[in-house]
């Protein structure tokens, strides 16, 4: 299937906080979203883990 699971990692503390899915055929680029990090206790940029 084209839709695969992935992990979002905080760019500040490198903690893996969120698990999501994306369609790799329609969105081949890496995901970047601002989400709340529980360790940093603030909104930070989360990127797709390699």
Curated annotation (Swiss-Prot):
Gene3D superfamilies: Ribosomal protein L33. The keyword 4Fe-4S does not apply. The keyword Lyase does not apply. Pfam families: Ribosomal_L33. Keywords: Ribonucleoprotein, Ribosomal protein. One of its GO terms (cellular component) is ribonucleoprotein complex. InterPro entries: Ribosomal_bL33 (IPR001705), Ribosomal_bL33_CS (IPR018264), Ribosomal_bL33_sf (IPR038584), Ribosomal_zn-bd (IPR011332). GO terms for molecular function: structural constituent of ribosome. One of its GO terms (biological process) is translation. PANTHER family: 50S RIBOSOMAL PROTEIN L33, CHLOROPLASTIC (PTHR43168), LARGE RIBOSOMAL SUBUNIT PROTEIN BL33C (PTHR43168:SF2). Belongs to the bacterial ribosomal protein bL33 family. This is Large ribosomal subunit protein bL33B. It comes from Mesomycoplasma hyopneumoniae (strain 7448).
């Amino acid at each position: 299937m084209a839709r695969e699971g992935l992990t979002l990692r905080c760019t500040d503390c490198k903690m893996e906080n969120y698990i999501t899915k994306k369609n790799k055929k329609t969105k081949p680029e890496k995901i970047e979203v601002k989400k709340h990090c529980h360790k940093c206790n603030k909104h930070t940029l989360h990127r797709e883990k390699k």
